[in-house]
Amino acid sequence: MIGTVCIAAAVLGLCAQVRRSLERNRLFRRDLAGGRVRIAPLYNQGAGFEALPLSARQMAPLSLAALWALLCRWGFRGVGAGLLLGGGLSNLWERLRHGRVLDYLRVPKAPGMLKRSTYTLAALAFFLGAALLVLRRRRR
């Protein structure tokens, strides 16, 4: 459980630092990895890729309930739980602190919908954590 909390804290801290750095550098845009990854900052006030037009205060209890339900279902231990918890709390913190999330990662050469969306490290940590939890559960 301590490892899970440490991973979650590391994700939360890293995501906060990246946001701070992007805002200090005036939301610069640039390509990385030969154009396979693009830094393209975009403020997101909604949720679920802006499919849910809810305010930060409306999203907070929903986010906490969803995190709690996922962790109760899949477990509170391990790397997957730490990544899921850290990613979820990072997005929640940004919504409460700033009223919106700063999405900044694009993958222009990815297939389908993946190339049209903009992500954060928090979202990637959340999705990777969820995938690890599902894989761990299937191995049992």
Placement of each model-derived feature along the sequence:
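Alpha-helical transmembrane bundles and membrane-interface segments of multipass inner-membrane proteins
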Residues: M1-R140
